[in-house]
Structures are given as C-alpha cells and as structure tokens.
Amino acid sequence: MKKITTAASLLLALILTGALMLAGCKKDVSINNAQSDTPQETAATQEATTDEAESEAIFDDVFNITASMNSSQVGEDLGMNANVSGLFELGSTNPTNQVRCFTISVVPNIPGVFPKTVTIDFGTGCLCRDGKYRKGKIVSIYTNRMTVPGAKVSTTFVGYFVDSFKVEGTHITENTSTSNMQGWKVQVINGKITNTNNNRWRQWNSLKNVLQIEGNGTVHFPLDDVYKITGNAHGSNSGGHTWSSLVVDPLIKKFSCRWIVQGKVRLSRDNREALLDYGNGTCDNVAVIFINGVPHIITL
C-alpha cells in the first residue's frame, strides 16, 4: 500500500505541476495578446500606416509632375509622358480646373542642353487640374530627358504645399530602362510632410523600383500605360512612433488613375504588424488597413 500511495502521490504531483505550467503558459499568451490589442497600440499602428499611405501618395504626385513636363510647358519634351497635353493631366482624364494658375521657368532655356533646372511656381495657391490646391515651388534638375536610360531628375521644394500638407525633402528619379521594358528607380530622401491643420508631421525615406508593365509598345499613347512598384520605406511621426514598410504584393499604378489601384504593403512597428491593402484594381482613393485581422478604411 505504501508503494501504491507513493506512486499515486507522484502522479498527482506531476499532474499538478503540468497544470501549473499550462496555466502559466496561458497567462503569458493572454498578456501578449492584451499588449498587442490595446486601443492605444492599435491606434498608433493605424496612425503609422495612414502616414505611410499618405506619404506614398504625396511623393507619388511629385513623380507624376516631373513625368508630365512636355514641349507645351517647357519648350521640349522632358518627361516620360511628355506627349500628353497639359501639366497634371497625368492621372486625371477628367480635369477639374482648366485654368493654368502657375508659372514655369527653365534654365537654360535651350533645347537639348542639360542639366536643366525647371521651376514650377504656384504662387500663393491655386486649384490645379487634378482638384488639389498647391502653393510654393517645385524645383527639378533634369540631367536629360526622363526617357533616356541613366537620366536623373532631382526635385526639391520651396514653401511647397499640397492642400494642407507642407512637403519637404529630396525626390530623385533615375531611368533604369532595359531594351524591352521602361523602368525607374525612385528615392525619397529625408522627406517630411507636415499637416498645417494640426501641426502633425511625419518623416519618410523610401526606395522604390517602377516598371512599366503595359503600354511599352504604344509610346505615343500613354492612356494604356500601367506601372508596377516594388520596394521599401521607413518613417517616424510626431507621435513618437517609428516604422518600416515593405511592398509584399506589387503596387499597381495606371496612367488613367491618379491613385494606386492594387497591391499590399506590410508595415512593422514595435514588433507589431499591419497590412495596407490598396484593393483589386478599382480606381478610387480608398485603402484598407488590417490590424490583427480587423479592417480600418482610410481615404487618401
């Protein structure tokens, strides 16, 4: 009986020990889940992901502008879609405002001579053809036409605003085209965007590769052009949050749409992740942020 009692006691002790271990494991898991699911952390992740999406949109707008420099604007075709009539037609087949409310200066204003500095001056503010208010100056230095392999366009800003957002930093586009596909490397260096309505800011650095995947055979008809974007970025904001991002499903940009229409970006912040989903090809300004599987709709 003593042996049986001892064995039973040992078995009971093992069961109790195992139960305590399981209870301890469950407690640890619940703590981790609670940490990742607090409203404050969810809000911080959503804020960082929204900042990422807005930064992408605003600096993509700079790419569009530098790519739309044509002979009617600057005396010669400098951009990659230069045959399109009118600045800011890119991404807007139904222009909001037909009145030109900006000035352009070119130095030297001699066709074929590079480098060439192009300054677009929006003055104290005007409503552009894509429906956005801009003011200040965009200053771009072209080493050659954007369609020439190896050409670079370096853009900086002087008191430049898009709606309520002040834009700072350096935007560089380099032509990396091959014999059968047009491509560009696009960098944002020390980018900063400040919302003057609430003084919130975000700093952003980005490295993206842009490939033209449709429309390569119709050089003089850009409306069928489609671009694939891959790459990564990192940023921080005035809320004290930092993050990094990676394109996990190539972003798709159509010439005929001013917004990214498809693709996914994974954002990482303090060991937490979010997924930014641009949709399935529909041309709209809506994206969805998924945090712990929960969707949050944002408007770009």
What do the predicted segments below correspond to?
Residues 2-12:
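Bacterial N-terminal signal peptides that target proteins for export
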Residues 27-300:
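Low-complexity, intrinsically disordered segments exposed to solvent
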Residues 2, 26-27:
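A general lysine-centric signal
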Residues 21-24:
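C-terminal motif of bacterial Sec signal peptides marking the signal peptidase cleavage site
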